[in-house]
């Protein structure tokens, strides 16, 4: 009976039985709720030279098993190699396979790919009962120390090999926290937030160098995917942050913390015609001698909306004049803008000098959780508040009615007692 009263009160106050469940829920990619305490449906094992991904066919925790053929790894669509049993699917892939991307940070080598569940209609039907899901996967290996089973024997590098060793530079592009002090712990964003990006080069024993972001492009899938469309330029024309020309306030940070580091912010966005909730940013990074004066080919320029002009991080202001009309040079980025992302690798390899002072680096995926002030959420909140107010009002009326009845019964009892005592 108590549970019935609780259910009645819950329905009265909350407006529906689905809100009466006290168990906390969280959302898997694709919007399917799963209890917090449940085991993870995707498990990753990072080995010395390969990764093993084990996927439960009950991917959404609903008891409905997904089809193994609907599961692939990476943009190459690597198929599962081993099926453990009827309820589990396993992928075995080398670290460099399945379109895996490698990124070098200060302390680690990061190999990243993604698990894709792309359901297809079965039995000639045109309906789907599960969602499309993209699960980011990362394997991190410490740069300091030995990850192999055999110890490395240190050796002296001959002098004639030292020059070539010193020419190797390590470029990186990382998502940072708002204070720029630490790397962002999770690549998740709401629309309306700002992404803090830090490009960096580790020079080692090289002569002092200054880093520049030549051009950056954003795509819903990793480059060089030939199907990367649509795309959006963030930086173009040898260092012009063109994304700041739109309604955003994207800009380079002034001053830069170190010559070998360049920081910039980008107002988060997503592609209107893309069903994916992910974003990849690929930047072409390059270096120049630290004592070289910035010019049209080596610059970092942001658009200032107040003055309606381009301003450099360092150097004379006139080096940014070409950003307004895009004729800084006949650069590979200009050709890239004409042909699109599918020509990225071909154009870069054809126009780039055959040296190690520039590189293409990708950060991602950036995962969108929806708008920070989503109208649907606001509408649900308003509806819930209305239901609660209505419920409280009805509960108050019921309480007052019950109190009136109790008071009336009490008075009647007192009156009856008085009448019975009169004959005495």
Curated annotation (Swiss-Prot):
Processing and modification events after translation: Proteolytically cleaved before the transmembrane segment to yield the secreted ectodomain incorporated in the zona pellucida. O-glycosylated; removal of O-linked glycans may play an important role in the post-fertilization block to polyspermy.
Tissue expression from the record: Expressed in oocytes.
Cellular compartments per GO CC: collagen-containing extracellular matrix; egg coat; extracellular space; plasma membrane
Cysteine disulfide partners in this protein: 46-139, 78-98, 216-283, 240-301
Keywords for the protein's UniProt record, in alphabetical order: Cell membrane, Cleavage on pair of basic residues, Disulfide bond, Extracellular matrix, Glycoprotein, Membrane, Pyrrolidone carboxylic acid, Receptor, Secreted, Signal, Transmembrane, Transmembrane helix
Location in or out of the cell: Cell membrane
Residues excised as propeptide: 352-424
Residues recorded with modification Pyrrolidone carboxylic acid: 23
TM regions (residue ranges): 388-408
GO molecular function: carbohydrate binding; receptor ligand activity; structural constituent of egg coat
GO biological process, one term: humoral immune response mediated by circulating immunoglobulin
Bilayer topology term: Single-pass type I membrane protein
Nucleotidyltransferase listed as a keyword: no
Tree of life domain: Eukaryota
Glycosylation site residues: 32, 34, 39, 146, 155, 162, 273, 304, 327, 330
Pfam families: Zona_pellucida (PF00100), ZP-N (PF23344)
SMART domains, sorted: ZP (SM00241)
Residue intervals on the Extracellular side: 23-387
Signal peptide: 1-22
Subunit organization: Polymers of ZP2 and ZP3 organized into long filaments cross-linked by ZP1 homodimers. Interacts with ZP1 and ZP2.
Protein family per UniProt: Belongs to the ZP domain family. ZPC subfamily.
Domain notes: The ZP domain is involved in the polymerization of the ZP proteins to form the zona pellucida.
Protein name: Zona pellucida sperm-binding protein 3
Originating gene: Zp3
